[in-house]
């Protein structure tokens, strides 16, 4: 199941009738990297759509040629008209900037995965295993750098520092605060240790931030010692979300990522002082979302010296 991506998504290669025709489906095409050597992926269910739109706008801000993938983890029928309008707006910005970026959409097929992957379970949110699967699929497809950014994040004008860490060390995730001892449940630690999935569990080390993760497919250490065991763990409940764990005593995907990154000795990650210019978790509602959106579009106008309207209605 790990690599059978066609079973991971509904109607994987088929056009989506309720989205604009420029929105691509299926395998990522090579021309999506004509102007940018990495791919950004994000995803959301209905309750995070607005903040995810803001994040996708910020992809244009950080690099006009950066292609991105939106993974639908549970949008409602009533969401698609709004999504289509916003994707048209982003497409209009791409056109104004003569961008080579591609816009991709895929809908996650939860019915083909274990029941405990259920994103609506507020206790564990399926261990966020669906996120790990989406990242891994794109690493296998593209064989390039894949950047996961949560909806609610705002990417900066320049991601040079973050990307340089990926070029140098094969992976990057900023620090999130507190330690492995506090946020990685003992049952997960035991599973990783007894199954020899890590070299060592460094309990005093800091936690990585699962809201922003980047991997380079062509880095052997990152793939062998972080990505592959991360995926294996994501498919194993005893590893990523043991019984009696919840988000109150365990950090699911972020917990496992933290243990693996430190065990693999990935430099410049998950350590205070080697932080990021990415604005993490700018979750918002109502007026505050609109103001954040205006900030991103205004920043696009300033960076590229264009005059994009602040919204599709302007």
Where are these regions (language model features)?
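Juxtamembrane luminal stem/stalk of type II transmembrane Golgi/ER carbohydrate-processing enzymes
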Residues: 1-38, 284-314
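A structural signal for well-ordered alpha-helical segments within the folded catalytic domains
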Residues: 50-53, 129-133, 251-259
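Active-site-proximal specificity loops/subdomain of glycosyltransferases
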Residues: 76-141
């Amino acid at each position: 199941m790990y690599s059978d991506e066609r079973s991971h998504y509904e109607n994987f290669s088929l056009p989506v009738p309720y989205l604009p025709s420029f929105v691509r489906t299926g395998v990522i095409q090579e021309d999506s990297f004509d102007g940018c050597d990495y791919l950004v992926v994000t995803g959301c269910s209905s309750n995070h759509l607005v903040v995810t739109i803001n994040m996708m706008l910020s992809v244009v801000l950080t690099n006009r040629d950066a292609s991105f993938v939106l993974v639908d983890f549970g949008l409602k029928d009533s969401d698609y008209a709004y999504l289509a309008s916003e994707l048209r707006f982003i497409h209009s910005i791409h056109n104004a900037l003569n961008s080579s970026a591609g816009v991709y959409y895929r809908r996650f097929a939860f019915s083909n995965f274990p029941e405990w992957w259920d994103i609506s379970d507020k206790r564990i949110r399926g261990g966020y295993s669906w996120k790990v699967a989406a990242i891994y699929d794109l690493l296998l497809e593209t064989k390039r750098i894949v950047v996961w950014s949560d909806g609610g994040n705002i990417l900066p004008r320049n991601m040079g520092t973050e990307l340089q860490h990926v070029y140098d060390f094969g992976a990057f995730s900023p620090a999130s605060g507190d330690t492995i001892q506090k946020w990685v449940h003992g049952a997960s630690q035991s599973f990783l240790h007894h199954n020899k999935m890590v070299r060592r569990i460094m309990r005093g080390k800091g936690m990585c931030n699962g809201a922003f993760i980047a991997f380079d497919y062509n880095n052997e250490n990152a793939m062998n010692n972080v990505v592959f065991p991360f995926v294996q763990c994501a498919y194993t409940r005893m590893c990523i979300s043991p019984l009696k764990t919840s988000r109150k005593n365990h950090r699911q995907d972020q917990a496992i990522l933290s243990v693996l990154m430190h065990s693999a000795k990935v430099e410049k990650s998950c350590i205070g002082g080697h932080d990021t210019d990415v604005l993490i978790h700018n979750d918002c509602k109502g007026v505050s979302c609109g103001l954040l959106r205006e900030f991103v579009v205004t920043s696009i106008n300033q960076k590229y010296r264009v005059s994009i309207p602040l919204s599709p209605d302007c």
